[in-house]
Amino acid sequence: MRISGIDAAKALQALAGRLPTPRRASLARLTDTDGGALDHALILWFPGPATATGEDLAELHLHGGRAVVAAVEAALAAMPGLRRAEAGEFTRRAFANGRIDLAEAEGLADLLAAETESQRVQALDHASGHVSRAVAGWQARLLALMAAAEAELNFADEDDVEVGEGVAQRVSEGMAALAGELGEWLARPAAEVIAEGLSVVIAGPPNAGKSTLINALAQRELAIVSPVAGTTRDVIETPLALDGIAMRFSDTAGLRGESADAIEMIGIDRAKAAVEGADILLWLGAPKEAPEHPRTILIAAQADRWRGDAAAEAEAAHCDLILSAATGEGMDRLHTMIVEMARTLLPREGEATLRQRQRDALAEAKGWLEVETGSREAGDLILLAERLRLAGATLDRITGRGGVEDMLDTLFGRFCIGK
């Protein structure tokens, strides 16, 4: 149990009768205001500001029984000045007190929600300050360019200020170089790709084995398998993780030209939309009928049914994979192919990614830094200095130094009470 704020010391003394040596675990008998025993617990005392929240902070390591926790909570609630923490309030106080910045707080939120290895790695990278350090480096370069521009504008006639010739050109070239680096970051996959999972769509004509395949991948019955064409009428989606990569697999209605069933036609339209939005397409059908898609795996499915059929064997030769979800043939190879294709959509090892909010700010900053070479503006230091200022203010939004109040409640509301 964690207590943070100006009354943390009073609360700990009231429960334990003393303040232990800072930052050392100590065994204590906890009592309520009437002297009644609550628990024997480990207590820790962290005087601010060098704490997680930047405030005085106390921790109680209790026995985990519900009655114990409830009794200690009741004792704390009876003390003046104390109240239950709101969701994410400890992290919000850390942000307000400068212990972490907004990008690190967002990384911590993602770390708490991480379910796959790739999500954990990305979130820990953000929470550890990778993005924040990059922003600090960009800001330092902006300040250097701004200093050069301001020196030329305000102090060019001073003997002790070295400005030299061609300052506007050097500043505009520095802006172009920085804009190029921001563009490289924007070209990376968005963080949401890892957080939300890649979309893998299973598509093909009716009775191609799509539902059998998604059931085999999920290792449970998600979709009805029937010899009757048109059984699947809607998109059936399930989250799966392959080799630590989050994915969303979708089974779709069989694609065919026309159907007398209006409901099936709605399902076909939804299937087509799913194919268009897929990151990876698994096509179970004739290769020549596969939709155009940059990342398609052509699958000759239901191999257990057509083995020995010369025509089917000839068509399968044009596919990437021969598979039977019923017998398991080709399933391991399909797993490998999906993972290999998925990795091409993910950031390289050690490469940080950006959330959409951060990408929007970075794109705006890049826009302020882009000035056409040889234009009048490229030679105007006053305009260049203003562009540099606006770019810096925009980058501040990534780490939470400006213009972010409207989204703080939403962010910290995602945290659990203990954070």
From Swiss-Prot:
Binding site for Mg(2+): 211, 232
Residues involved in K(+) binding: 207, 226, 228, 231
Co-factor note (free text): Binds 1 potassium ion per subunit.
Compartment annotation: Cytoplasm
Residues binding (6S)-5-formyl-5,6,7,8-tetrahydrofolate: 2, 59, 99, 419
Biological role stated in the UniProt entry: Exhibits a very high intrinsic GTPase hydrolysis rate. Involved in the addition of a carboxymethylaminomethyl (cmnm) group at the wobble position (U34) of certain tRNAs, forming tRNA-cmnm(5)s(2)U34.
Full protein name: tRNA modification GTPase MnmE
Organism, as annotated: Sphingopyxis alaskensis (strain DSM 13593 / LMG 18877 / RB2256)
Gene encoding the protein: mnmE
